[in-house]
């Protein structure tokens, strides 16, 4: 019998949890084959294992675009209940934001299309073939408010998933929306409240914290939520996602932060009416100065 290499020892140990379920009938024939394959070939890429387990390949697929086969039914059903509830709670403020500036909604949809098409990933290792994309959620929260940004992201997720994972995986769309958008929006709301509550009304603070820093922190929060969620999936049982997948979110958070901060500064200078959360009277009044000696 072929013995696994030292590099595959950790992977093989985690695959034992899958093997233990083989006799219980919880795994399909494909998953049984994948368990055996992973144990005797620890260098096998996760994309190949997933192809055997679930019938799809992970090449050029994004870890932030969910497949239905990644999750058990209770997770999907819970998302079917949670997403409509969240949308209902956000409906009134989202409608108010729409009435104030509908043009900003169209611009934000264009930003979503651009941000979500910009991706990065690793080509080697167990997670070779998986891709990550930017969000633009922090920018959306500044433009139309968190409630409206959540609605737009939920609507945009449908055509996005049709193009990336296909109609057969739309059942995972509600869970995808919750995992990708809610953490980043929660961070945006928290930081924006902290800036207005505890810091002086400074234009630099608005751009740097609400734009740059908030986008980076939101991406990290989304990455943590996705990693924690996918860690519960048997498809990724052979991989330590916290060590191999989560660090990538830290890298792409810089791109998210740079683009969000740049567009925030542009809007403040040229089109402040596109920023629902920006108030000229609050941030640009004469008594607000950068240096104490100017007052």
Where are these regions (language model features)?
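Short helix-perturbing small/polar motifs within transmembrane alpha-helices
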Residues: 85-90, 162-223
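Ser/Thr-rich, low-complexity intrinsically disordered segments
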Residues: 1-17, 24
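Membrane-embedded alpha-helical hairpins and interfacial helices in multi-pass inner-membrane proteins
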Residues: 64-69, 196-269
């Amino acid at each position: 019998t072929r013995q696994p290499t030292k590099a595959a020892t950790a992977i093989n140990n985690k695959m034992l949890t899958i093997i233990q379920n083989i006799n219980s009938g919880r795994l399909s024939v494909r998953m049984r084959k994948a368990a055996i394959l992973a144990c005797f070939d620890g260098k096998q890429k996760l994309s190949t294992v997933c192809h055997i387990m679930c019938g799809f390949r992970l090449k050029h697929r994004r870890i932030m675009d969910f497949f239905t086969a990644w999750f058990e039914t209770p997770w999907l059903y819970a998302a079917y209940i949670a997403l409509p509830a969240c949308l209902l709670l956000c409906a009134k403020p989202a409608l108010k934001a729409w009435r104030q500036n509908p043009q900003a909604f169209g611009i934000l949809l264009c930003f979503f299309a651009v941000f979500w098409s910009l991706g990065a990933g690793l080509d080697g290792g167990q997670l070779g073939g998986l891709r990550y994309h930017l969000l633009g959620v922090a920018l959306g929260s500044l433009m139309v408010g968190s409630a409206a940004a959540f609605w737009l992201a939920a609507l945009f997720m449908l055509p996005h998933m049709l193009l990336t994972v296909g109609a057969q995986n739309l059942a995972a769309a509600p869970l995808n929306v919750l995992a990708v958008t809610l953490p980043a929006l929660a961070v945006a709301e928290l930081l924006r409240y902290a800036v207005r509550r505890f810091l002086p009304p400074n234009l630099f603070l608005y751009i740097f914290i609400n734009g740059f820093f908030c986008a980076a922190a939101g991406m990290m929060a989304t990455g943590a939520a996705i990693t924690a969620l996918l860690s519960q999936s048997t498809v990724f049982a052979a991989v330590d996602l916290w060590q191999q997948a989560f660090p990538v979110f830290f890298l792409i958070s810089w791109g998210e932060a740079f683009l969000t901060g740049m567009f925030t500064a542009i809007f403040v200078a040229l089109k402040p009416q596109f920023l629902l959360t920006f108030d000229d009277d609050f941030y640009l009044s004469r008594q607000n100065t950068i240096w104490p000696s100017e007052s």
